[in-house]
């Protein structure tokens, strides 16, 4: 059985549902015994209605792939027996310049608080169950996720020993070196987590427009930047994670291809898949082209191997 809630967070990172703490405490306590918890953040230019539609589509299509995988042989050994999902809703329909900062605020305060509530509820139990916590972000939602992890790491919050932490960043809209030790999210790698990042040559938003916008914001820095979702993780980031596994995702990709990769950091190239699906949108290309069976198979193989 699966359960799903939404967590509305305003532009100041304040959770607008006053009951969210008690809901999460109940969810982490008996008689519930969830094996997997998902926290997902949407990206830029998504209103509340659009966010719900995105979450509904993503969760249903991922669930469909998990059921199909469960019926295959050999199957993935750690498919979720019972899951609980939290969908983060935050106001993201402003300019590029405003949204980057807002995403960090939402993560640093709102999603950080959600994670603290989950950890504290588990730690209060006499015998906390084993739990896999899966964080997913798309576009600026990756900033939401990473700023929350950065804050968890910096303030010394103890992730309960029974919690296994996995993170997926789909077409992340931040600089490719922000996970370096001196980057905005440089402390996140110190947590005991596994990380899957995707990139694509077909992502026009990140490959073409993101560097221009960053240069305008930092006019006098003289620094050339690339987005993580366009260039992939920097060499320094890969070293910080102890190396990176690399995989290309094309038409017909299935989960067995990612299962053998044991590195903490996996870099997945979606370029072959996007190239096979046409030119994409005029402005954004394939930036939001994440609703494919092959991508769900990639995520499943990473999370549940």
Question: What positions do the PLM features span?
Answer:
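Short, surface-exposed "cap/lid" segments of acyl-processing enzymes
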Residues: 29-94
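Long, contiguous juxta-domain segments that are non-catalytic but functionally important
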Residues: 1-32, 49, 67, 71-75
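Gly/Ala-rich beta-loop-alpha elbow adjacent to hydrolase catalytic centers
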Residues: 136-141, 145
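Lipolytic serine-hydrolase domain surface
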Residues: 1-18, 44-45, 53-56, 78-80, ...
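Surface-exposed alpha-helical segments enriched in charged/polar residues
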Residues: 25, 29, 60-63, 116, ...
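Short hydrophobic segments within beta-strands
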Residues: 40-41, 136, 198
């Amino acid at each position: 059985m699966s359960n799903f809630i939404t967590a509305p967070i305003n532009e100041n990172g304040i959770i607008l549902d006053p009951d969210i703490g008690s809901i999460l405490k109940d969810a982490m306590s008996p008689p519930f015994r969830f094996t997997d918890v998902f926290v997902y953040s949407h990206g830029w230019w998504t209103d509340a209605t659009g966010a719900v539609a995105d979450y509904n589509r993503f969760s249903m299509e991922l669930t469909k792939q998990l059921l199909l995988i469960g019926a295959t042989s050999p199957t993935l050994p750690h498919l979720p027996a019972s899951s609980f999902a939290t969908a983060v809703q935050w106001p993201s329909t402003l300019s590029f310049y405003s949204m980057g900062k807002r995403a960090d605020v939402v993560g640093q305060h709102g999603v950080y608080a959600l994670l603290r509530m989950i950890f504290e509820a588990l730690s209060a139990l006499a015998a906390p169950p084993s739990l896999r916590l899966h964080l997913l972000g798309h576009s600026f939602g990756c900033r939401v996720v990473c700023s929350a992890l950065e804050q968890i790491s910096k303030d010394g919050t103890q992730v309960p020993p029974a919690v296994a932490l996995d993170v997926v960043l789909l077409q992340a809209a931040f600089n490719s070196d922000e996970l370096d030790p001196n980057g905005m999210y440089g402390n996140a790698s110190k947590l005991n987590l596994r990380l899957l990042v995707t990139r694509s040559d077909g992502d026009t938003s990140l490959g073409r427009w993101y560097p221009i916008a960053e240069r305008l914001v930092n006019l006098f820095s003289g620094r050339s930047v690339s987005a993580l979702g366009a260039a992939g993780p920097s060499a320094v980031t890969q070293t910080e994670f102890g190396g990176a596994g690399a995989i290309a995702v094309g038409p017909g990709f299935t989960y067995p291809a990612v299962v053998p990769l044991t590195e903490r950091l996996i870099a997945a190239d979606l370029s072959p898949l996007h190239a096979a699906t046409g030119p994409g949108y005029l402005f954004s290309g394939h930036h939001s082209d994440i609703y494919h069976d092959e991508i769900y198979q990639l995520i499943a193989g990473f999370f549940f191997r």
